[in-house]
Amino acid sequence: MYELKNKSLEISKVFKDSTNYKDFKDYLYNNKYNLLGFNSSYKIFKGYKELEYTTGILYLQPSDHVAAKTLCPMAELSGCKDPCLRVSGRLGMNNAQLAMARRTVQYLQDPDGFKDRLRTEILKNEKDKYCIRLNGTSDIDWSDLIGSLPNIQFYDYSKVLKRAIKNNLPNYHLTYSASFNNLQSIE
């Protein structure tokens, strides 16, 4: 289990102040909220319209925004911590930020329960042309979950070169995401 940062206390205040829920814990652990967003961005929706692929993406609070230990191990070294995708477009809106924080705290407090819930949601929404991206705004090794769902196609981008090189799961397309700061790792 990850240690939560003091910032998570600020997030809990934001949750309380921005919802009609009386009890923060009920709000935080309410399972009526989806973990995955389906066809939720313009680029992904365009793929759905043109290729008829349904894409589910998991967005968490990345780097060390909620946890004392980062969910993006290469964020600082790669120089992508501050200009992170987490604040672009709709993800930068307050509701999206709160949803990412809620999911992240759920994952950090109960990783096994979170993975079970995620697996159930993936299977419940399965379609013919279907793919899942678990690291929409994080860089977590999900290979155990992905390996347990061999009939589902997954894809991700990672700044962890070793993970990209060692990936041997046939249902997981992992692209190494180079940046100016980590180009030397390719050489």
In which residue ranges do the predicted regions lie?
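Class I S-adenosyl-L-methionine
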Residues: M1-E187
